[in-house]
């Protein structure tokens, strides 16, 4: 089912990439009104697979390898494709903030309950300071996510021990936006979260 959904994501990304990069303003939340997001998801994972290296993009559109010593447990996900991919992989309980979706009705019905369980959900992006207070260990989003106007650069987060992942088709320098790139993103997420079999089944659907 997710494979069919990708076909819908891709035209939207190709046609609206420039517009969407600026349509979700950064919003500074009052710390007193933010939900407390303590602790982390209890997970089981194959320790023999880690450390593992995954190739991703940085804020300059350059490919680089990030090394993971364990699957992420406190995730910030930006835009619907990032959020739904994580929900489809069965790791929605690790998302502490999901941003870029105007309403839960836009999430696929089978993932909606898990989406609603995410502690913080909003169309608007949180500001950098608030996200740092949430103590994420992984941020997934688009190229436009990792700019000074939104959540700062990938380097900013990597220097603070936070892994990042940029959707390949969101790179403005990439003129070849394909479903295969989306499949690669799903497979990479599967590796990062120790959900490789699930990721492979998703791209075959």
What is the role of each PLM region?
Residues 153-205:
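Extracytoplasmic substrate-binding proteins
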Residues 106-107, 147-151, 175:
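Extracytoplasmic/secreted cell-surface and envelope-processing proteins
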Residues 58, 99-102, 168:
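Residues at the C-termini of beta-strands that transition into short coil/loop
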Residues 76-134, 138, 142-144:
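A short, structured surface patch at a secondary-structure boundary
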Residues 73, 92-95, 135-137, 159-165, ...:
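Loop/turn elements at helix/coil->beta-strand transitions in domains of secreted/extracellular proteins
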Residues 74, 80-81, 133-140, 145-156, ...:
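Active-site-adjacent structural elements in enzyme catalytic domains
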Residues 2-27:
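Sec-dependent N-terminal signal peptides of Gram-positive bacterial secreted proteins and lipoproteins
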Residues 23-84, 197-205:
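Bacterial Sec-exported substrate-binding components of ABC uptake systems
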């Amino acid at each position: 089912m997710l494979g069919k959904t990708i076909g819908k994501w891709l035209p939207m990304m190709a046609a609206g990439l420039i517009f969407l990069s600026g349509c979700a303003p950064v919003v500074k939340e009052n710390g007193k009104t933010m939900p407390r997001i303590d602790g982390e998801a209890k997970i089981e994972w194959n320790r023999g697979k880690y450390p593992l290296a995954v190739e991703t993009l940085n804020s300059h559109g350059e490919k680089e390898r990030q090394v993971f010593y364990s699957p992420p447990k406190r995730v910030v996900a930006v835009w619907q494709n990032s959020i739904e991919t994580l929900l489809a992989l069965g790791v929605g309980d690790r998302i502490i903030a999901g941003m870029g979706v105007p309403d839960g009705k836009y999430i696929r019905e089978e993932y909606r309950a898990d989406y609603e369980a995410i502690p913080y959900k909003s169309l608007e992006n949180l500001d950098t300071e608030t996200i740092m207070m949430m103590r994420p260990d992984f941020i997934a989003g688009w190229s436009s996510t990792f700019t000074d106007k939104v959540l700062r650069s990938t380097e900013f987060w990597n220097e603070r021990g936070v892994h990042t992942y940029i959707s390949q088709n969101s790179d403005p320098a990439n003129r070849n936006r394909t479903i295969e790139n989306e499949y690669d993103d799903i497979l990479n997420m599967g590796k990062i979260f120790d959900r490789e079999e699930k990721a492979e089944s998703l791209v075959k659907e």
